[in-house]
């Protein structure tokens, strides 16, 4: 993927960068793999905001992605590489030999016309999905399952990858893109290769309006609010927060406070925590 820069014809254009979408081969998605997607705007079933800074944005259709990769032994051919507004990675439309069509996360260097396959007997080739007990040590992988048959949950964002470091009984040891090293059951599946769209992290939003197109609302500092809106608010001019440590709008400590559970069940599988 290339990155397009603009002449500074306005303050919004000055820093803005956009993708050239060179890898995208079609702008029309497969209708049978689309689903309606209603906007939640950060609200729960009571209508209360549970996630701030969400709302608005362009209307989207959800693309049904095959994270399970459980169509074993049937060869699929890459028909298109497409843009997906719901994720940072691109997606690939796969036409299988039995006539079924599925979307998958598009790995780096996967091209139209390439053949992929899933299952324990699949070759170690970009886009193929196998149980991790069949993947050689040192292989770069993505779309990793945490529970057998549940579908890939880890390493799905653009440009990310993990590495299979070794084996430990019925587990494999995997180093994730965050730097965390953890054990995962060796029956769980993973896809060979790195997630595509590597330049996504280099994009610059450039202006506030483009964030609004993405459904991201402004983040307002508590110190510029009134005291009835935030514990940091009020005072004359640029007043300090008047507390030992910063807090959330609801008075709970934040900015540096650890929020992970003390007795998280997954602690037993983590060998080395992620990089800070």
UniProtKB/Swiss-Prot annotation:
One of its GO terms (biological process) is cytoplasmic translation. PROSITE patterns: RIBOSOMAL_L2. Keywords: Ribonucleoprotein, Ribosomal protein, RNA-binding, rRNA-binding. InterPro entries: NA-bd_OB-fold (IPR012340), Rib_uL2_dom2 (IPR014722), Ribosomal_uL2 (IPR002171), Ribosomal_uL2_bac/org-type (IPR005880), Ribosomal_uL2_C (IPR022669), Ribosomal_uL2_CS (IPR022671), Ribosomal_uL2_dom3 (IPR014726), Ribosomal_uL2_RNA-bd_dom (IPR022666). Gene3D superfamilies: 2.30.30.30, Nucleic acid-binding proteins (2.40.50.140), Ribosomal protein L2, domain 3 (4.10.950.10). GO terms for molecular function: rRNA binding; structural constituent of ribosome; transferase activity. Residues 221-276 are annotated as: Disordered. The keyword Transferase does not apply. It comes from the Bacteria. It holds the Pfam family Ribosomal_L2_C. SUPFAM superfamilies: Nucleic acid-binding proteins, Translation proteins SH3-like domain. GO terms for cellular component: large ribosomal subunit. The keyword RNA-binding applies. HAMAP family: Ribosomal_uL2_B (MF_01320_B). Belongs to the universal ribosomal protein uL2 family. One of the primary rRNA binding proteins. Required for association of the 30S and 50S subunits to form the 70S ribosome, for tRNA binding and peptide bond formation. It has been suggested to have peptidyltransferase activity; this is somewhat controversial. Makes several contacts with the 16S rRNA in the 70S ribosome. Part of the 50S ribosomal subunit. Forms a bridge to the 30S subunit in the 70S ribosome. This is Large ribosomal subunit protein uL2. It comes from Brevibacillus brevis (strain 47 / JCM 6285 / NBRC 100599).
């Amino acid at each position: 993927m290339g990155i397009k820069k603009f002449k500074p014809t306005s303050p919004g254009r000055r820093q803005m960068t956009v993708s050239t979408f060179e890898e995208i081969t079609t702008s029309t998605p497969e209708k049978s793999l689309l689903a309606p997607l209603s906007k939640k705007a950060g609200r729960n079933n009571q209508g209360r905001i549970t996630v701030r800074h969400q709302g608005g944005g362009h209307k989207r259709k959800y693309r049904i992605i095959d994270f399970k990769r459980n169509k074993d032994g049937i060869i699929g051919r890459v028909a298109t590489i497409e843009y997906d507004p719901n994720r940072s990675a691109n997606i690939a439309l796969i036409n299988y030999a039995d006539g079924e069509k599925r979307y998958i996360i598009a790995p780096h260097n996967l091209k139209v016309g390439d053949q992929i396959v899933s299952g324990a007997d699949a070759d170690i080739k970009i886009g193929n999905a196998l149980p991790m007990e069949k993947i050689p040590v040192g292989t770069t992988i993505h779309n990793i399952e945490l529970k057998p048959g549940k579908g890939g949950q880890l390493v799905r964002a653009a440009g990310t990858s993990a590495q299979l470091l070794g084996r430990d009984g019925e587990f494999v040891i995997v180093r994730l893109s965050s730097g965390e090293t953890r054990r995962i059951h060796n029956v769980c599946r993973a896809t060979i290769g790195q997630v595509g769209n590597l330049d996504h992290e280099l994009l610059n939003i450039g202006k506030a309006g483009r964030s609004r197109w993405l459904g991201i609302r402004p983040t307002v500092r508590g110190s510029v609010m009134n005291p009835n809106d935030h514990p940091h608010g009020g005072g004359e001019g640029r007043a300090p927060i008047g507390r030992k440590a910063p807090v959330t709008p609801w008075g709970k400590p934040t900015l540096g406070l650890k929020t992970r559970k003390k007795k998280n069940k997954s602690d037993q599988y983590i060998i080395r925590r992620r990089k800070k």
